[in-house]
Structures are given as C-alpha cells and as structure tokens.
C-alpha cells in the first residue's frame, strides 16, 4: 500500500503480470485412482506408504466425507487383492449394522452418499467383508492448526475386503491424522496405500511417515480440480476454465 497512485498502480501491474506468467506453477498434479494403483504395483517392499488425498470429499472443506468413489475404483482395479489399503467413509447406518453384526462376522453393506444425496457425485454401492473392529472412534489430532483437538467419529466399524480395510464412521471428522486409523487398530505406516479426506492439513502428520503424497482428481463438493465445479455466472473466457486465452494488463 502506498500513497503515490502511479507507483501503486505500477506495482499492482507488475504483480498481476508476475502471477499471470507463473499461473501454471500454481496448478497441482492430480492423479486418477488407476494411476495410483499402477504406481503401487511398482512400489518395492519396505517403501513408505502412498498417501492419497480425496480432497473433493474433505469434511474440513465442507464436504460430507461419504463419497465411495475411491473405494469403488480401488476395488475395480483389484487393489484389495494386491495392496494393503486403508480407507475411510462416513455412513452411520452401515457403521451401525456392522457394529451390530460384531467382530468376526461377514456383512454385506450399502455404503456411501447417505449425507450427500446429489446423484451427480455418485450413488451407494454394495460391499461384502469381514468386521475387524467395532467401537467409539475417538482420537487426538497431533499437529497443525487443530493440534491437541479431540476428534470424535461416533460409532464406527472396520470392515476388511481382502487386504483393504474400510473404516466406516457415524460422523464426519478430520481424517488427515494417522491417529484416526490407529485408534481403531490400523497402522498407516505398515500400509501400502492410505486414504485421507483432507486437502492440505494432513501433511502436518503424514509427511512424518512418507514423502509419497498424491492428490486425487475425484468428483465432489470440494474438488482439487476447479473444472469439476459448475459456475453459472462467470465471464468467459476465464482461467483456468479456459487455457487458450490471451491476457494483458491493460485489457
């Protein structure tokens, strides 16, 4: 902020030009679940886990945490047969049914989209697995802006589908801390693929475990890919929705 109008405008123009010149450097590399499975197939024993972020379904960003997109894709690619995967989903009815069945029981559940019922994002799916754990999910967040906050998932259950463990919770909560899985007997450090539903805050604790972090290109309320959002009142052309436009400071 300056008192000289001409100098202030000149500096604003300089910054605008700099941002435009470097606009592509702000873009994050996004991965499909299929790409993650291929990379996991090449992973060597003893390598640190892959942490995959489904930021489109982040409760911290206003999403509901009940998307089954990543689960569906991992199963479709057969990852549950080859890789130790840890996933989470919010689904109170499914958590209750698994808890009622009890540890060791085989259950068939419909999971996903009990809170977000907009069909454009997805639909419930049926799974069959073995109940590994039931209980009340409570953990303390280790680091970042919510350090030492107690998170409560409500009634929860872990259902195993092959080598994949799905943590089904009653309530949405922050899922970007390894303590979420650890409080139900799952260890992220020993997994091949770990799902978090967090855009960035998860790095505070997960970067202590691994540098293999991947942001997914998934549909949802808070996607990493802005093109996945619908804007009805937007001037076109507009970056990044249009990438072939020319822009000048005086335009």
Where are these regions (language model features)?
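Hard-cation-handling environments
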Residues: 1-171
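Extended hydrophobic packing segments that form well-structured cores
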Residues: 20, 138-251
């Amino acid at each position: 902020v300056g008192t000289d109008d001409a100098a202030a405008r000149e500096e604003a123009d300089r910054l605008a030009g700099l941002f435009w010149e470097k606009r592509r450097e702000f873009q994050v590399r996004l991965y499909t679940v299929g790409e993650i499975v291929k990379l996991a197939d090449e992973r060597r024993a003893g390598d640190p886990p892959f942490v995959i972020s489904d930021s489109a379904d982040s409760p911290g960003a206003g999403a509901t945490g009940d998307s089954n997109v990543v689960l569906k894709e991992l199963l479709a690619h057969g990852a549950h047969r080859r890789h130790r995967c840890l996933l989470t989903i919010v689904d109170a009815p499914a958590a209750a049914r698994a808890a009622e069945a009890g540890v060791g029981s085989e259950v068939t559940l419909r999971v996903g989209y009990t809170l977000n019922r907009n069909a454009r994002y997805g639909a419930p799916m049926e799974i069959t697995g073995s109940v590994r754990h039931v209980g009340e999910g409570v953990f303390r967040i280790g680091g970042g802006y919510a350090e030492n906050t107690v998170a409560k998932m409500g009634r929860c259950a872990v259902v195993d589908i092959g080598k994949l463990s799905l943590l089904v919770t009653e309530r949405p909560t922050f899922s970007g801390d390894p303590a979420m899985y650890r409080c139900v007997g799952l260890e992220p450090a020993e997994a091949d693929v770990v799902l978090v539903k967090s855009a960035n805050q998860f790095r505070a604790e997960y970067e202590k475990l691994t540098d293999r972090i991947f942001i997914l290109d998934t549909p949802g309320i808070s996607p990493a890919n802005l093109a996945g959002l619908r804007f009805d009142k937007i001037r076109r052309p507009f970056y990044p929705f249009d990438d072939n436009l020319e822009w000048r400071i005086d335009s």
